[in-house]
Amino acid sequence: MLKWALFFAVVAVIAGVLGFTGVAAGAAAIAKFLFIVFVILCVVFLVLGFVVTKKIVD
């Protein structure tokens, strides 16, 4: 689960860089939307990773 959280964090950063720097000016709105989606998914998978790990360890 933590691997997925890291994956979504990297994808969110890449989408943000492309969307906010003007590199892909035509797709900036799509990149901003994807940035928010991937940040939310990153947080969800990060929390799930910690919850599952805690249940496995206990």
Swiss-Prot record:
Its main location: membrane. The chain crosses the membrane at residues 4-24, 33-53. It holds the Pfam family DUF1328. It is found in: Cell membrane. Keywords: Cell membrane, Membrane, Transmembrane, Transmembrane helix. It comes from the Bacteria. One of its GO terms (cellular component) is plasma membrane. This is UPF0391 membrane protein Bxeno_A2959. It is a multi-pass membrane protein. Belongs to the UPF0391 family.
